[in-house]
Curated annotation (Swiss-Prot):
PROSITE patterns: RIBOSOMAL_S15 (PS00362). Keywords: Ribonucleoprotein, Ribosomal protein, RNA-binding, rRNA-binding. The keyword Ribosomal protein applies. CDD domains: Ribosomal_S15p_S13e. NCBIfam families: S15_bact. This is Small ribosomal subunit protein uS15. GO terms for molecular function: rRNA binding; structural constituent of ribosome. One of the primary rRNA binding proteins, it binds directly to 16S rRNA where it helps nucleate assembly of the platform of the 30S subunit by binding and bridging several RNA helices of the 16S rRNA. Forms an intersubunit bridge (bridge B4) with the 23S rRNA of the 50S subunit in the ribosome. The gene is rpsO. One of its GO terms (biological process) is translation. Belongs to the universal ribosomal protein uS15 family. Part of the 30S ribosomal subunit. Forms a bridge to the 50S subunit in the 70S ribosome, contacting the 23S rRNA. GO terms for cellular component: cytosolic small ribosomal subunit.
Length: 90
């Protein structure tokens, strides 16, 4: 399930470091978090959709790795990001 372009641009503009930044870890984590929440809502309705469940697990793992990298390189941005997105600190 892809994100709508308007939603994607809104998330990118909110978390981007610069004007044309789309690849920083903060932006990637924010986009993944939105996709994860959308997939979670989808799976509440479609309980037997196991392919989407596997996709969700892959997205969560990817976000976990990006958060680990961000925590290691810039802890201040990491703590700000998880508080903004409402993600637990592990």
């Amino acid at each position: 399930m892809a994100l709508d372009s308007a939603i994607k641009l809104e998330i990118i503009s909110k978390f981007a470091r610069g004007e044309k930044d789309t690849g920083s870890p903060e932006v990637q984590v924010a986009l993944l978090s939105r996709r994860i929440s959308d997939l979670t809502e989808h799976l509440k309705v479609n309980v037997k959709d196991h392919a989407s469940r596997l996709g969700l697990l892959k997205l969560v793992a990817q976000r976990k790795h990006l958060l680990k990298y961000l925590k290691k390189t810039d802890y201040a941005k990491y703590s700000e990001l998880i508080s903004t997105l409402g993600i637990r600190d592990r």
